[in-house]
From Swiss-Prot:
Listed InterPro entries: Znf_RING, Znf_RING/FYVE/PHD
Swiss-Prot/TrEMBL keywords: Coiled coil, Metal-binding, Zinc, Zinc-finger
Cell cycle is among the record's keywords: no
Coiled coil: 54-106
Identification of the protein by name: Putative RING finger protein 175R
Annotated S-S bridges: none
ZnF endpoints (RING-type): 137-170
SUPFAM superfamilies noted in UniProt: RING/U-box
Pfam families: zf-C3HC4_3
Organism whose genome encodes this protein: Invertebrate iridescent virus 6 (IIV-6)
Molecular function as annotated in GO: zinc ion binding
Origin organism lineage: Viruses, Varidnaviria, Bamfordvirae, Nucleocytoviricota, Megaviricetes
């Protein structure tokens, strides 16, 4: 066995994970003779220098390992971002689909409400020869028309207040004009 300095022996012992010697005493605090006796009696420390790896090679391996770790971390970060982006897109698509479904349901409900609010007509149809003041509201079929929408369809003022879409062409109502027709 070749003779090694105490500092080299301590470095090797620490590298191998041996921190404490006899009776749990820290090896760096041990006397030289006690430390050498401990090393000689210990079977777990190989004191030969043949197995030593050059420091440059260790540094290169460490750098390669760091690069691999950084690469793996970056891949994980990128994958997490991609997953979050996909989840956000799915969520936005679901929201869009639900909003469209809600809008369709609201349109259906408004159409049903209009149909339910219209009483069944028991009178004969109105003659086309009548003057405008005799034209009844197409929604309630009770009151004469006096309001014109932007699409040029007409209704009575009470029905016009409740409407957001034209009952005839289903276009949104942007403008409501109250008109009074002349009596002949």
């Amino acid at each position: 066995m070749e003779k090694l300095l105490k500092s080299e022996l301590k470095v090797r012992a620490i590298r191998l994970g041996i921190r404490n010697g006899y009776h749990g005493r820290v090896i760096s605090k041990m006397r030289k003779k006690d430390f050498i006796d401990f090393i000689n009696e210990s079977d777990c420390i190989d004191l030969t220098c043949d197995d030593d790896i050059p420091v440059n090679q260790l540094k290169k391996e460490l750098q390669e390992t760091k690069k691999k770790v950084n690469e793996i971390q970056q891949n994980a970060i990128n994958r997490e971002r991609e997953i979050r982006r996909e989840a956000l897109n799915r969520e936005q698509n679901l929201i869009r689909v639900h909003e469209d479904a809600i809008n369709n349901l609201l349109l259906c409900f408004s159409a049903l409400n209009l149909e339910e609010s219209q009483p069944v007509q028991t009178e004969p149809p109105i003659d086309d020869n009548n003057v405008p003041e005799n034209i009844l509201c197409p929604v309630c079929l009770i009151v004469k028309v006096n309001t014109v929408f932007n699409c040029t369809h007409v209704s009575c003022s009470s029905c016009a207040k409740r409407l957001n879409v034209c009952p005839i062409c289903r276009n949104p109502i942007r403008k409501k004009e109250l008109r009074f027709f002349r009596l002949n």
